[in-house]
Each structure stands twice: as C-alpha cells, then as structure tokens.
Amino acid sequence: MTVTPRYLDHGQARRIYDRIGRYQDTRPLSERRAMDEIAWRGDFYNAAAVLEFGCGTGRFATRLLETKLPAGAAYLGLDVSPTMVGLAREALAPWGGRTRVELSDGSTTLPVADGEYDRLLSTYVLDLLSPSDSETLLDEAYRALRPRGLLALASLTPGSTPPSRALAGLWKGLWRIDPRVVGGCRPVELAALIAPERWRVRDRLTVTRSALSSEVLIAERL
C-alpha cells in the first residue's frame, strides 16, 4: 500500500514549535556540528545584512552577533511560532535597533525588498516544508539576496553510512505515516533543490553523529 506524504500545514507547524520552545536548543550532536559548519563557512565576518528564515529561539543569531558579524551588521529573524519569536526577541534585546524578529504567517514569501540582504540563513526548515513551499522559499531567497550574496542551509538528509541510511529510512517511514511523530521533518537532499543557473555551490558536506545525518550547503547567488 502506498502512503501519500502529508506535509504539516502552517498551523500544525506553529503548534509543534510553540510546544518545543526552549527545548529546541538541546539539539542532537549532528545538528550542533552542522551549525558550527555554517558559522565557519558562511563568511559572516563580511556580512552587512542577515535574514534568518526560521530563527527559532535566536540562539544562533546571538552566536553570530557575539562572534561573527561586524558591529554595523543588521539582522532580521522570521519564525512561524509566537513562542519562538518571544524567545528570540528576548535573546536579541542587547543588540537593540540592529535586530528585528517578526512573526511569520507561515508563508514562504519573504516580506523584504529585492536585494536587501547579503546573507540568507535557514536551518532545519526545508526538511519541514512541502516541495512547493521549498521552491517558493528558494525563489524568494534569490530575490532577496544581492548578487554574490550567500545562502546558508542545513537540513536532515539521507545517511552516507549503513547505520545512518537505516535511521533515515526509519525516520522517513514514520514521517509518511504521521509527520507529527517526527516534528514534521524528514530527510531531504538540499543540493537537488538548488538551480545551477541561479546559484554556485561553494560548500556542501554531510555531518553524521550517532547515525543522524545533516547536510550543510553554502551557495552564492549568481
């Protein structure tokens, strides 16, 4: 019997992440390593304006502001969860007018001007979105970024070792039955979503810890 995938709608995703709240910061080792790679490879030292789609609690933005971003760099975070938005605003309050965190209605259409940003960051979001929403988000990222701006992504991904492939298969099987069981996320291949006529992939790697794999991808807007 074929099970038709059922992606979470925006309301379901909002409720899940409202419940998760601060627990989102207790990430598995593979996710923490993926975030380390993005911080290192995203050339944030030279960024002037950063947009994060799915900012969560603001923990990664805090790290960037403390250790990577220039003193004058601006930051905008968007999230579908009111709980996450509240936590992120609290975390980023020390940076005052340099930062904004806004509640998203769940749309992947970005409320920003063309070419307004030189870094666009989205981690563990594309593995939650439907294919059509993912396509829209990447179209919007292309619109929002300046030429040579960088897109930084991380996602759950199919494994590269026998244990990680087995876990990814089990995870995707559970997701097909009921995506809420796994928080709405499933393993995806980020590189397959990137249009080569629009983006040049600068870095791509898979990080595996305890059989859980994440893909990290940095692409330059052409």
Task: Please tell me what each predicted stretch does.
Residues 198-199, 206-222:
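Core SAM-dependent methyltransferase catalytic element
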Residues 119-132:
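A short SAM/SAH-binding and catalytic strip from SAM-dependent methyltransferases
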Residues 51-53, 57-108:
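Class I SAM-dependent methyltransferase SAM/SAH-binding core
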Residues 135-147:
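A short glycine-rich, Lys/Arg-flanked "PGG" loop and its adjoining helix->strand segment in the class I
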Residues 154-197:
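C-terminal alpha-helical "lid/dimerization" subdomain adjacent to the S-adenosyl-L-methionine
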Residues 1-45, 59:
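Conserved class I S-adenosyl-L-methionine
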Residues 111-120:
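A short acidic, Gly/Pro-enriched loop at the edge of an enzyme's catalytic core
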Residues 49, 148-150:
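Short glycine-centered segments of the SAM/dcSAM-binding site in methyltransferase folds
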